[in-house]
């Protein structure tokens, strides 16, 4: 059921690992701030009925979260966004339509909460997605593509994710794409009887850092190839065994690419970093893990190189998270309750400023009449304080029942009719007692850290 028009109309479009192939997700992926800003600006320019917008782009999903103007048809916005994506990413509308999942209103809120709580992830319970959503929100907020509506939504999503983590055991086992990749590499080493536990890691972003930490926990020596030596120096300060990690500039890739049996690649590059022209034949078999989207490794021409992509790891992920069903069920209960609580909170935000406005109107009216009475000497000046207290108590008593009724009805869909009628009766339509000055109330946890 669609909520009445005084509430924000939330809307999501999602392309995920469940509905779209890796090859297609590569085309949608956005890996730079400049590209993301340009894409959001295109939406703002060509979709005037979208009030606020943000984009979440990860290796397993590309999602658009938006709030729509009142009386806007969601299907029209869906078609407009798919058209923008088709033109921007040089993809066919029919391919996009087959893979897209659209949600509106409560379903959209439930979807955002589920994604943020890692219930929709390839690795259920992984915590990386919450940080990715915070970064996506922060960017859209700072670039002024989102404001009150999405701030409220994301604030609640982060609270929901924290509650899921704290009240279930869904994140305790620490399974992630990076941990599954390293575990598979370890299995390969045992089967291949490779004794020299050395690995080459290309990249130093969040995914690469997680891989490195998992490798070190399994007693590997790691050579990192990257572009930023200062970032490497900061990173090794976090490590318990920094001596097992070394760094070389990625310009030296040719010197190392054929020397390691084990390679992990996870960068934000939109192009292949490891290319066939760099490869030479080796006497040993090689096992490469490409954890990037778009992929960083060109399909090898040599038969003794075995390449694993993110999607290739999915069966191993399912095997590792099979015993989380009970936690997952509990987590969905929390998300369902959070969705209800979110709408109750949103509806109460419409009522609270109205209650404040009514009380302020009563106070001003009482004070105005008291000053008239004092001026005309109907009452002595020395009684002013006592009369103010009497009037204050009187209008509090008068407004007590309406206040209770407003708060009670705030959780009902017809509350907008009641709110609108009261605003009209008391000429409060132009009141600004809440929204702008209280925007900080709706800011997400990111800004509270």
Swiss-Prot record:
Signal peptide: none annotated. Pfam families: GlutR_dimer, GlutR_N, Shikimate_DH. One of its GO terms (molecular function) is NADP binding. It is an enzyme of class 1 (oxidoreductase). The keyword DNA-binding does not apply. Pathway: Porphyrin-containing compound metabolism; protoporphyrin-IX biosynthesis; 5-aminolevulinate from L-glutamyl-tRNA(Glu): step 1/2. PROSITE patterns: GLUTR (PS00747). The record marks 111 as: Important for activity. Keywords: NADP, Oxidoreductase, Porphyrin biosynthesis. Its EC number is 1.2.1.70. NADP(+) binds at residues 203-208. It catalyses: (S)-4-amino-5-oxopentanoate + tRNA(Glu) + NADP(+) = L-glutamyl-tRNA(Glu) + NADPH + H(+). It comes from the Bacteria. The keyword Kinase does not apply. Substrate binds at residues 58-61, 121, 126-128, 132. InterPro entries: 4pyrrol_synth_GluRdtase, 4pyrrol_synth_GluRdtase_dimer, 4pyrrol_synth_GluRdtase_N, GluRdtase_CS, GluRdtase_dimer_dom_sf, GluRdtase_N_sf, NAD(P)-bd_dom_sf, Shikm_DH/Glu-tRNA_Rdtase. GO terms for biological process: protoporphyrinogen IX biosynthetic process. The active site is at 59 (nucleophile). Catalyzes the NADPH-dependent reduction of glutamyl-tRNA(Glu) to glutamate 1-semialdehyde (GSA). During catalysis, the active site Cys acts as a nucleophile attacking the alpha-carbonyl group of tRNA-bound glutamate with the formation of a thioester intermediate between enzyme and glutamate, and the concomitant release of tRNA(Glu). The thioester intermediate is finally reduced by direct hydride transfer from NADPH, to form the product GSA. Belongs to the glutamyl-tRNA reductase family. Possesses an unusual extended V-shaped dimeric structure with each monomer consisting of three distinct domains arranged along a curved 'spinal' alpha-helix. The N-terminal catalytic domain specifically recognizes the glutamate moiety of the substrate. The second domain is the NADPH-binding domain, and the third C-terminal domain is responsible for dimerization. Homodimer. This is Glutamyl-tRNA reductase. It comes from Helicobacter pylori (strain G27). The gene is hemA.
